[in-house]
């Protein structure tokens, strides 16, 4: 009620003359009822009425007591928002509630004020602008998500800064502006689904290319504007470079932005993952990407053994395989300039992952240094290259080892024996990952027990 916005809102109150007179009479009647219902107040009025004997005032009803403001506008000036949370019979003014409740009330007040104000505007193009700094402060997660819905319903331009993954988890990622410091300079990045650039003289080759790939490239010869509507690949990059002749710097910028375009499927995959992870990945300083849940369980423990901590280092782990593919995350990291390291299996699927990263426009040098392949086919087999971890494998699946598997070991067929043990572990990957952690809690690994590829990945994001 002390907010300037509240005062502006109250000034918008409009009551007709007839209704105002009726209210005025009701208020006067209420005031008179209050006075006459109490003997002490009546006696006080009678005593004060004697003032005319001293001051020589003329007329009747010289003295009265205003128990309530007698003017409607005086009454409105004392209006305030009161809230009862339902647990008591008391109504408390909004300024006696917590910061979170006050913030929500202020935003909803703005919502109502904007609606009234815009209805009074004669220009159809009139639009309000709402700027909010960390509206999630002092609110629990469910309240933050509910607040986001209320803000989203406000019909105006909204500029909001937030540090809450809960606030952004249901937003359209294309509305996101990602702000970060880079070498002392503030950088702002965004996700886009097309890239538009102008060319002073559109080459014939580009026009022919747009005819052949109309789903990707659109040319407006009248405005000399080229629109790339879908992410390009290496082949299309070569074709664009071949038919355009601006400076190398200009064409490089065009190609770089064309690789950063997100198609609808990629945006849907990212939206789904952000909702699952509560948007946490967008606040991380670095990403460690891996294929499955087993890595999600075990890699933080490996980091601890190496004297590192993912949370302290600002690292978010991302399971890319169960959320579409690696490509959208590699592209998002490029768009937002988030450093990353990716782990991939050394199999056909792993090679497919490398191809997805390559199609995001990364150089071969970046791919070879940031996409780390297991020396074996997958995570469980890679862990089995460590003698200590393989021994632990045997311990956690001991009840499932059959006589046939034991005979493989006794006959000296070590490779086949290891394969069978790994298969048993893989039958319950996640459960067995937790069994390993439980085992290691009493008998910790050493850094030498961790396969080299995971040491390199962890140090790559934590240093």
Describe every region a protein language model picked out.
Residues 77, 100-101, 125, 153-155, ...:
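Short, well-ordered loop/turn elements at secondary-structure boundaries
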Residues 1-105, 109-132:
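Extended helical coiled-coil dimerization/tether regions that scaffold
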Residues 14, 31-42, 134-138, 320, ...:
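Generic amphipathic alpha-helical segments used as scaffolds and interaction surfaces in large
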Residues 39, 43, 100-102, 142, ...:
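Generic recognition of stable, solvent-exposed alpha-helical segments in well-folded globular domains
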Residues 82-256, 260, 264, 268-272, ...:
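Switch/communication elements of ASCE P-loop NTPase nucleotide-binding domains
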Residues 67, 162-164, 329:
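Short beta-alpha junctions and helix-cap segments that line functional grooves
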Residues 207-289, 293-463:
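Acidic, Mg2+-coordinating catalytic modules of nucleic-acid enzymes
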Residues 5, 47, 106-109, 146-150, ...:
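Alpha-helical scaffold elements adjacent to nucleotide-binding pockets in ATP/GTP-utilizing enzyme cores
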């Amino acid at each position: 009620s002390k907010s300037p916005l509240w005062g502006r809102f109250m000034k918008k109150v409009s009551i007709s003359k007839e209704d105002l007179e009726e209210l005025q009479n009701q208020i006067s009647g209420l005031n008179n009822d209050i006075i006459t219902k109490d003997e002490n107040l009546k006696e006080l009025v009678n005593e004060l009425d004697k003032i005319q004997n001293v001051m020589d005032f003329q007329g009747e009803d010289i003295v009265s007591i205003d128990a309530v403001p007698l003017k409607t506008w005086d009454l409105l000036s004392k209006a305030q928002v009161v809230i009862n949370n339902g647990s008591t019979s008391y109504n408390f003014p909004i300024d006696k509630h917590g910061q979170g409740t006050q913030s929500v009330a202020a935003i909803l007040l703005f919502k109502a004020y904007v609606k009234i104000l815009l209805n009074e505007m004669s220009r159809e193009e009139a639009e309000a602008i709402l700027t909010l700094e960390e509206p999630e402060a002092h609110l629990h997660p469910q309240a933050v998500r509910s607040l986001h819905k209320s803000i989203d319903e406000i019909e105006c331009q909204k500029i909001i800064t937030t540090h809450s993954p809960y606030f952004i988890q249901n937003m359209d990622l294309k509305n996101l502006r990602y702000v970060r410091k880079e070498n002392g300079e503030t950088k702002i990045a965004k996700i886009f689904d097309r890239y538009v650039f102008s060319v002073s003289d559109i080459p014939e080759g580009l026009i022919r290319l747009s005819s052949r790939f109309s789903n990707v490239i659109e040319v407006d010869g009248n405005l000399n504007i080229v629109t790339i509507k879908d992410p390009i690949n290496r082949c299309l990059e070569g074709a664009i470079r071949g038919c355009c002749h601006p400076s190398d710097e200009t064409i490089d910028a065009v190609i770089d932005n064309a690789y950063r375009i997100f198609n609808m499927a990629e945006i849907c995959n990212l939206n789904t993952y952000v909702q699952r992870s509560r948007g946490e990945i967008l606040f991380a300083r670095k990403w460690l990407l891996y294929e499955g849940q087993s890595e999600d369980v075990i890699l933080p423990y490996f980091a601890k053994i190496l004297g590192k901590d993912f949370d302290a280092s600002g690292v978010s782990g991302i399971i890319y395989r169960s959320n579409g593919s690696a490509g959208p995350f590699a592209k998002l990291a490029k768009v937002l300039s988030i450093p990353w390291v990716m782990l991939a299996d050394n199999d056909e699927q792993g090679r497919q992952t490398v191809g997805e990263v390559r199609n995001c426009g990364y150089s071969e040098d970046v791919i070879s240094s940031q996409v780390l392949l297991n020396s074996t086919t997958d995570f469980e087999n890679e862990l089995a290259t460590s003698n200590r971890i393989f021994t632990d494998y045997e311990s956690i699946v001991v009840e499932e080892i059959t006589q046939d598997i034991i005979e493989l070991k006794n006959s000296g067929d070590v490779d086949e024996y290891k394969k069978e043990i790994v298969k048993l572990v893989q039958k319950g990957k996640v459960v067995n990952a937790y069994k390993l952690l439980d085992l290691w809690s009493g008998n910790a690994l050493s850094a030498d027990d961790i396969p080299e590829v995971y040491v390199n990945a962890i140090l790559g994001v934590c240093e």
